[in-house]
Amino acid sequence: MKKLTIAFLLLSSLSFAYTRKEQIQENLSKMGIKQAIIDETKKIDYEIRDIVAFENDETVIGEKLNKLLAILKKDERNYIVSEDIITIYESKIGKDYEKYLDLFTKYTPYEYEKLFANMVYYRGIGKKDKSDGYYKEIEKKYNNTPIMEIVKIFNIANEDNRQIQIKKVLNLLKSEDVKRQVGMADEEVHSMNLTYTLTEVRKYYNDGKIEKAVSEYINNVVNANVSNEVHEYNRLKETLLLLNVLMINEEITNKKLREQNKQKLESTYISKEIKKATAKDADYLDKYLNEM
């Protein structure tokens, strides 16, 4: 499950050509789901993109969940909506979601997700032996494949080792075929890259490697080949990461390097969008961040 597989990956040299909207349209239309429902699914999926990381208002969460449940009622084959419901139940509500897990595993077009979803579910309810059984089944069926490399991430407890594994997966995700095989759209992959990069930036900063922290962001995010649509999907994450890196950059003592970095940081899509919005409303950034 994409939102449950929060593994957070990607390299700056990736070529993006498979958006979340395209994925939803392609997969749901193949299943014969009505276009009106597909359009509703695209809309709500976009609306809840930040709910796991940033939304804590129970009223807002409840409203989004009710919208999802209403869409699912129209066609139970809508595995995208089942997945989104599972994500909210698991991350925000803590309620048992086995009913929706059954629907998801019944209709997802990605065979490995049926096993992976059960692995995550049984781990979450404390049935480790059963969860491990699903992991072994995945290992047997998908050994030496990109799918297995992604799943391995969830069995690595040590952060440094997990980052190494994620980097390995990033290289695999350079392939458009691999992205489609594992069902990861551009927006999700970029989101993973942002989180991966945040972990690296934090690590270098805590180790006193200020210049390296900034260069990591520049290499992974500034130089990424990402469409404006992908940027917008991840706007909040990008904004927060950029603001943090801008502050870190100010601690660099080499003035020339600091200014060079600043120019690169301010050339990004998100930086330009912030400047445009701030020019219209001086309080834009405070208002935007307070909406979290």
State what each model feature region is.
Residues 257-292:
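Terminal, low-structured helical/coil segments at or just beyond the last alpha-helical repeat
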Residues 49-53, 88, 121, 155-156, ...:
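Residue-level signature for tetratricopeptide repeat
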Residues 36-48, 61, 75-84, 107-117, ...:
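Generic helix N-cap/helix-start motif at coil->alpha-helix transitions
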Residues 92-93, 125, 159, 207:
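Structural motif corresponding to the intra-repeat A-B loop/turn of tetratricopeptide repeats
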Residues 62-72, 96-107, 129-140, 162-178, ...:
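Alpha-helical repeat scaffolds
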Residues 17-83:
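N-terminal leader/linker segments that initiate helical-solenoid repeat arrays
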Residues 206-256:
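Intrinsically disordered, low-complexity segments enriched in Gly and acidic/Ser/Thr residues
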Residues 1-20:
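Classical Sec-dependent N-terminal signal peptides that target proteins to the secretory pathway
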